Each structure stands twice: as structure tokens, then as C-alpha cells.
């Protein structure tokens, strides 16, 4: 089978045009790792860029890479039509069996549905939900992304829903859905945890209202002041926002807090190794990678009972869940984990087994092939 994967090259997104090798979002990257283990498939990764960059022709023996430069006018101002048309011309030359657009945040979904080939989309962030929550106030980004998401949902052959939450959001708009979680980068399965002597809680995510880091600090303040734990925050945010300023004020006034900023995947692996537990107090999420990655790394995971999280965690079996609106539940969950080593060990072991069984890259890649075959068989 010949497959086109449309995904964002984060060199372009982050302004790292000097790098000579592409890097992608954690979920698409892990999926490509899985495809690399299936030699009888041919994968072509296409990423649009606003500047020319040096790039390898192949990412693996069976995975080709195409960096496609598109002029500035072909991006958001044209509703990504320039990206879609340039990609369409290249896809015709490749002549794939199927096209897979990764995400509705930017250009990839439009490129897939306008490709002229059988196609599916994966919804990573639900743009219509973000727009309804009025995130990034003062910006039209989410409103535009939500409108394009709706258009693409109606035009695609189907959606790979990475959670039941997303399936329920899109199933009335799109012809077909398949429920399949993200894959996890294989490096996290190799971690051997060695937690710090003082319990270290790891938060991974954007420093903003939706992920709720301020709520986490306030809930845990008694534990932090009693020197029962520390919290490390791996992520960044809008330093001009009121939320960031409140977060920074707490960072300066409450003991035991550390801001790591945005860190590499290798550095994140080291943080998993040191962590006593991983916490995600989010108010809304689809298939949060930190939950999957923490489980793969063999670290106990506690997360909000919202969005797609209940698909990933079996409460009291391979993780713990809580209500993010109730600070006492966040605090009680963390207290249980930092004080009960037997509980941590049991949940970490079960979580790791779940990750190997359900989130390993090769397993997820093979299930994607089944989805592609479903699409082709229905034509």
C-alpha cells in the first residue's frame, strides 16, 4: 500500500529553518515509527513550508519525505488553498492509495480533502471546541480553524477519532469514524524510572487556562509548603497573558515549584525517569500524549476525568482520575500517590502493560492500515 501522510514540519512552525532534519508532532512521529517497522508499505510524508530547507529524501527505508515550499499568500490568508493546490500536484505524481491528513489546526486537513484521492483525517485538537471556549481571545485563529474543520469533516471519507469524546463531536458531520488512540514514541517504552527521593510531580503541557496549572498549584499548596513534594512544569505559554502572570507569581511565592519550559523529547524522557507521578489537571483534552507517554514510561499517571481521558485510564487499575473543578480531589489524589508506594507500583505496572498492548507504534500503525483498507473497500 502506498500512503501519503500530511503533517506539519515543526521546523517551519518554530522558525528552525536551520535544522536539516524535520521533526513532527509527537503523535504523527510515533505513527511513522510504527510504519517504519512494516517494510511492505510505502509512506510519503509531505510537509508544506514557507521557506526552503535542507531535508533528507528518506526518514526510513520505506518512508519518503517531501518538503514543499509554498509562498506566504498560500497559507492562512487563502484558507490554505495555496498549500492544498501545491500538495495536490505532488500527490498526483506520487499516486497513492490513500491520503491521511494529520490535524485540523493548520493546512493538513484542507490538503487531504482537496487531494482528489481517498482520504481520512485525524483530529488532534478539536478546533470547534477551542473556538466555543473563546480561547486566544482577540484572535480570529480558532474561529477560522473551526470553520475549516467543519468544512473538512464534511468532505473527507472518514475520521480517525483518537477518543470517544472526539468521535461524539464529529460523527454527525462526517461519513464514518474509527476509534483509535495515538501511538507513543518508542523511546518512552525504554525508560527505567528512578524517582527523586523527594516526590517529584511532573506536569507536561501549555501554561494556560485549559491545562489548569494554576489550579494544580493552588490545590497542592499545603503539600508543597509542608515539603511533601515538588512540581516540575514542562511547557510554555503566553508571557503577556494575565494567566501567565498569575502562574509566575505563584512560581515565585510557593516553594517546591520548577519551570522547565518547552523541552526536547529526550529531556522529557529524563523527566519521566525522575518523576514520582505524572499529573494532568486539564479542563478539556482529546487524547493527551502525556498520559500515554507516562504510562509507557512506567510512571503512575493521574488525570482529569474529562474529554478522552476515560478512554485511556481505567480508574484505580492503570491510573487515577479526578474532577479538575474540585481542588480537594486533585490534592487527595496526589496525596494518595506520594504516600502509598504500593499503590504507585501497582498502577505504574498496569499502566505500562496497557501502553505496550494499546499504544505501541507498530500496533497503532497496523490498525491504521486496517482503516485505510476499509476506506478503499467502500469505494
Predicted feature locations:
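Short, structured helix-loop element that forms part of the nucleotide-activated donor/catalytic region
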Residues: 230-256, 267-271, 343
Amino acid at each position: 500500500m502506498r500512503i501519503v501522510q500530511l503533517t506539519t514540519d515543526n521546523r517551519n512552525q518554530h522558525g528552525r529553518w536551520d535544522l536539516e532534519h524535520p521533526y513532527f508532532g509527537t503523535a504523527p512521529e510515533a505513527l511513522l515509527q510504527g510504519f517504519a517497522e512494516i517494510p511492505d508499505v510505502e509512506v510519503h510524508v509531505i510537509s508544506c513550508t514557507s521557506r526552503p530547507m535542507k531535508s533528507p529524501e528518506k526518514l526510513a527505508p520505506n518512508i519518503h519525505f517531501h518538503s514543499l515550499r509554498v509562498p506566504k499568500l498560500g497559507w492562512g490568508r487563502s484558507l490554505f488553498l495555496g498549500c492544498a493546490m501545491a500538495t495536490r500536484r505532488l500527490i498526483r505524481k506520487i499516486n497513492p492509495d490513500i491520503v491521511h491528513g494529520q490535524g485540523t489546526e493548520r493546512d493538513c486537513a484542507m490538503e487531504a480533502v482537496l487531494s482528489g484521492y481517498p482520504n481520512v483525517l485525524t483530529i488532534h485538537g478539536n478546533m470547534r471546541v477551542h473556538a466555543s471556549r473563546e480561547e486566544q481571545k482577540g484572535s480570529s485563529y480558532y474561529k477560522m480553524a473551526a470553520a475549516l474543520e467543519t468544512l473538512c469533516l464534511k468532505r473527507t471519507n472518514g475520521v480517525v477519532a483518537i477518543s470517544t469524546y472526539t468521535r461524539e463531536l464529529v460523527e454527525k458531520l462526517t461519513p464514518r469514524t474509527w476509534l483509535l488512540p495515538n501511538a507513543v514514541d518508542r523511546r518512552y517504552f525504554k525508560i527505567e524510572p528512578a524517582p527523586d527521593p523527594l516526590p517529584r510531580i511532573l506536569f507536561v503541557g501549555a501554561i494556560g487556562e485549559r491545562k489548569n496549572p494554576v489550579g494544580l498549584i493552588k490545590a497542592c499548596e499545603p503539600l508543597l509548603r509542608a515539603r511533601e513534594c515538588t512540581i516540575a512544569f514542562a511547557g510554555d505559554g503566553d508571557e503577556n497573558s494575565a494567566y501567565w502572570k498569575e502562574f509566575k507569581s505563584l512560581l515565585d511565592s510557593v516553594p517546591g515549584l520548577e519551570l522547565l519550559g518547552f523541552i526536547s523529547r529526550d529531556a522529557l524522557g529524563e523527566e519521566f525517569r525522575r518523576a514520582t507521578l505524572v499529573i494532568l489537571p486539564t479542563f478539556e483534552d482529546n487524547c493527551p500524549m502525556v498520559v500515554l507517554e507516562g504510562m509507557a514510561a512506567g510512571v503512575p499517571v493521574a488525570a482529569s476525568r474529562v474529554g478522552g481521558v476515560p478512554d485511556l485510564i481505567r480508574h484505580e487499575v492503570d491510573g487515577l482520575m479526578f474532577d479538575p473543578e474540585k481542588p480537594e480531589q486533585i490534592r487527595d489524589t496526589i496525596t494518595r500517590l506520594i504516600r502509598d508506594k504500593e499503590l504507585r507500583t501497582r498502577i505504574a505496572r498496569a499502566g505500562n502493560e496497557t501502553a505496550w498492548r494499546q499504544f505501541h507504534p507498530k500496533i497503532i500503525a497496523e490498525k491504521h492500515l486496517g482503516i485505510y483498507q476499509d476506506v478503499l473497500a467502500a469505494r
